[in-house]
Amino acid sequence: NNFERDIERRQMRDEIYRRDAVETYKYDGTVQDLLDNPNDISDFIRHHLEAQVPRLQMLDDYYQGLNFNIMRNKRRREKHLADNRAAHDFASYITDFINGYCFGHAIQVQSDKEMTQSKLNELHSLNDVDSHNRSLGLDLSIFGRAYEYIIRNQEDEVRFYKSDPRNTFVIYDTSVEKNSLMAIRYWKVATEDSVELTEVESNIYYVDVITDQATYFYEANSVTNLELSERKPPEAHSFGKVTITEFSNNEKRRGDF
């Protein structure tokens, strides 16, 4: 598709055409093997940052109408000629139309058992599931993937949240069943408003590693090759599964534009 390929964007050509930009992460080992070898987790995070995030960010820019060739300052060689091209939001039109078509009618989850249905209704009401599903659908259309994060909060409530594909991924085993080993969430601690930070401080990432038994909390720094160090003790959970689920728009993990 022309939005995603954008053949004139020479400065980003390597990022656009990287075949591993839609790679599904797999690990030939157990969850404990990964936890015992944190450098392997760092390698996955580094690859996601370098190979996948640039493409995902570009797709989000297109959705917001930030067309690279139109928005850049020097966009044509003939400086003496006019350039009246205008930025457009065709990507937004495509995504919003498809999202409305797919999720305009709420997904129904029903049970024949009255007590079960009552619990489902309470859960759906608490989490505004219809809006939540539409939000997941938006990410599916833009990025080709979406992530749902389930937690039990301090009030002992089960809550559903969306996790950004630009800082979330799942690592699977190598079996044909494609079982989730763990999910990774990471984010940069420093913001654009942060001032007077050293080079080390401005490149710190917080990393959450979610397994089927617990969530582990790490700190990493791009200056030290994203080497992980524990930032606080792990917290056990009782879900018995990795609580981040990845949804794909299609087999190729491609969006709608």
Located regions from the model:
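Short amphipathic alpha-helical surface micro-motifs
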Residues: 23, 128-132, 165-166, 238-244
